[in-house]
Amino acid sequence: MSKEKQCRPGPRVPKCSRCRNHSLKTPLKGHKRFCRWKDCHCLKCKLIVDRQRVMAAQVALRRQQAQEEELGICSPEASSGPEVVVKNEAGADCLFSVEGRSGTPAPPPNPNPLSVAGSYSASSSSPSAAARVYSEEASDQPLETSYYNFYQPSRYSSYYGNLYNYQQYQQMPPSDGRLSGHSMPSQYRMHSFYPGTAYLPQGLGSPVPPYFSLEDNDGAAASFFPSSLTSTHDSTLTYRSISSLVNDGVKAEFESGGQPPSSRPTP
């Protein structure tokens, strides 16, 4: 009996970890304030300090969780696995599969229960973390289809863009062969005071016919422009008809032997 009592180990007495790092065995009870290496900054003592901080944080977290459960702020729920969010990148929609909802089957629970418990305690420890997780899940939800229909560019914009719009370039009224920047005033364009036949020598019996007459020009303009544009150029056609009548009168007067009217001032 005495041998058995001697072989039995005594009660476990906690030892000082700092003293153990320095190859000493000192009981921890009443030794914390008198430890030689309580201010030591070696690598092993730094690891001990970090371990103590982590353990203290875990204890505080457990106390806070217990207080919240007593007050009824949050109730623990037994979840087989975390929520799964599946994103379909081909389409613009997201599929959420949660327990109790119809959707894609959830994967089997994590075989490591410690990691699941640690993640659950970290997520439910503070309400701010839960709110952050909810906001992230809400941001992944699909938007309405009208949003994509409104902001999505049309596929056939290049073909149907100018179908019912106005023409791209504004059509200018037909000119008399002059440049647009060197147009003459209207009082000089209405009457031709100097026809080409007035400067011919007297020996020629008949005037040289021009390359084209104003009547031919009017016919070519009428055939070139469609009928829908004739209403927009009524003033141009009226001017041409008047000028053709005036030129015909001047030609008849010149052929009868009269002198063409001169706009030069008489001395």
Curated annotation (Swiss-Prot):
Top-level taxon in the UniProt lineage: Eukaryota
What tissues express this gene product?
Answer: Testis-specific. Localizes to Sertoli cells.
Q: Which Pfam families match?
A: DM (PF00751), Dmrt1 (PF12374)
Native organism is Oryzias latipes (Japanese rice fish)
Inactivation phenotype = Feminization of XY offsprings.
UniProt-recorded Gene Ontology molecular function terms: DNA-binding transcription factor activity, RNA polymerase II-specific; metal ion binding; RNA polymerase II cis-regulatory region sequence-specific DNA binding
Is Phosphoprotein included in the keywords of this UniProt record? no
Q: Name the major location.
A: nucleus
**Would the keyword Zinc-finger be found if you checked this record's keyword annotation?**
no
Q: Which UniProt keywords apply?
A: Activator, Developmental protein, Differentiation, DNA-binding, Metal-binding, Nucleus, Repressor, Sexual differentiation, Transcription, Transcription regulation, Zinc
Give the start-end ranges of region Disordered: 98-121
Q: What is this protein called?
A: Doublesex- and mab-3-related transcription factor 1Y
- Known DNA-binding region: 16-63
The cross-references to SMART domains, in alphabetical order and at most eight, read: DM (SM00301)
GO CC list: nucleus
The job of this chain, per UniProt, is described as: Transcription factor that plays a key role in male sex determination and differentiation by controlling testis development and germ cell proliferation. Acts both as a transcription repressor and activator.
Q: Which family does the entry's similarity section mention?
A: Belongs to the DMRT family.
Q: Which residues form a coiled coil?
A: none
The biological process GO terms on file are: cell differentiation; male sex determination; male sex differentiation; regulation of transcription by RNA polymerase II; sex differentiation
Instruction: Enumerate the subcellular locations listed in this protein's record, separating them with semicolons.
Output: Nucleus
